[in-house]
UniProtKB/Swiss-Prot annotation:
GO cellular component, one term: cytosol
Organism per entry: Escherichia coli O1:K1 / APEC
Pfam families in the record: Amidohydro_1
InterPro entries: Amidohydro-rel, DHOdimr, Dihydroorotase_CS, Metal_Hydrolase
Name of the molecule in the record: Dihydroorotase
GO molecular function, one term: zinc ion binding
Length: 348
């Protein structure tokens, strides 16, 4: 038996699902991503959401202005789908290289999604246009009906929304984002080449027991919510199999500490500083490090039809302690795995 490798050299990764927020928060969090990743799909759920080419161009510039000198980072912008969105605006943004993809949030599914889509039928002209021009649809795959249990919302979405949509628009490219269930893992694996998925580090590392047993851990609270162990294991097995239509999407979602540690706390894990090492740990635990680079750096570009990055980064296998918090202007930000000792980290 050989000793585990102490250095992992991989092609520079991309993050295919990222929240950067805006204003002072954006300026704080951007460097944690731009330091490591070549590109990131940036979520459009600002207040107000990014629904026009003009808004996306302006937001992209604010992101670029926050990238430190020496970082080579390209934000890939997305359009927030609404019931009233003009298909021509979406197509113009795609053709001009402003929009890389469009995001479907069911109304009120997650942070700043009150403008989201009330039904797929309401945006069918937009989706038909996307199918025609080859624009990927990114989906937060949960139903939001009040009578459906929060732990069942992803599985119900597959049968009631996702499958009918893909049957109707057979050429539409779809990314099932941040999948959290065995149902979704099986669905994506059994799908065709036009269906892919992203998985977060927290859904690979933890299940709902970690969040709820022995005290509520608000910094593990995200949406879709952590599920039971059987679902966590299915996700781990999917990435460890080398399946090539699943790729890195951190869903890093920063909230100030007082908005997380609250009587009605916000959903989201700020994992940008620790995500890549977390993924490496999971792949190592699953004896699947041979598939780690593809998950981080190859599968995503392949699905999107983009070139892979031509630079490389290294991760080192040495214990490091994660910072307890990161300073904001008037609060602090608690990173994923705050205060814990991690096994893998990006070589500085």
């Amino acid at each position: 038996m050989t000793a585990p490798s102490q250095v992992l050299k991989i092609r520079r990764p991309d993050d295919w699902h990222l929240h950067l927020r805006d204003g002072d928060m954006l300026k704080t969090v951007v460097p944690y991503t731009s330091e490591i990743y070549g590109r990131a799909i940036v979520m459009p759920n600002l207040a107000p959401p990014v629904t026009t080419v003009e808004a996306a161009v302006a937001y992209r510039q604010r992101i670029l202005d926050a990238v430190p000198a020496g970082h080579d980072f390209t934000p890939l912008m997305t359009c927030y789908l609404t019931d009233s969105l003009d298909p021509n605006e979406l197509e113009r943004g795609f053709n001009e290289g402003v929009f890389t993809a469009a995001k479907l949030y069911p109304a009120n599914a997650t942070t700043n999604s009150s403008h989201g889509v009330t039904s797929v039928d309401a945006i069918m002209p937009v989706l038909e246009r996307m199918e025609k021009i080859g624009m990927p649809l990114l989906v937060h795959g949960e139903v939001t009906h009040a009578d459906i249990d929060i732990f069942d919302r992803e599985a119900r979405f597959i049968e009631s929304v996702m499958e009918p949509l893909r049957q109707r628009l057979t050429a539409l490219k779809v990314v099932f984002e941040h999948i959290t269930t065995k149902d979704a893992a099986d669905y994506v694996r059994d799908g065709n080449e036009r269906l892919a998925a992203t998985i977060t580090p927290q859904h690979l590392m933890f299940n709902r027991n970690h969040m709820l047993v022995g005290g509520v851990r608000p910094h593990l609270y995200c949406l879709p919510i952590l599920k039971r162990n059987i679902h966590q294991q299915a996700l781990r097995e999917l990435v460890a199999s080398g399946f090539n239509r699943v790729f890195l999407g951190t869903d890093s979602a920063p909230h100030a500490r007082h908005r997380k540690e609250s009587s009605c706390g916000c959903a989201g894990c700020f994992n940008a500083p620790t995500a890549l090492g977390s993924y490496a740990t999971v792949f190592e635990e699953m004896n699947a490090l041979q598939y780690f680079e593809a998950f981080c750096s190859v599968n995503g570009p392949q699905f999107y039809g983009l070139p892979v990055n031509d630079t490389f980064i290294e991760l080192v296998r040495e214990e490091q302690q994660v910072a307890e918090s990161i300073a904001l202007t008037d609060d602090t930000l608690v990173p994923f795995l705050a205060g814990e000792t991690v096994r893998w980290s990006v070589k500085q």
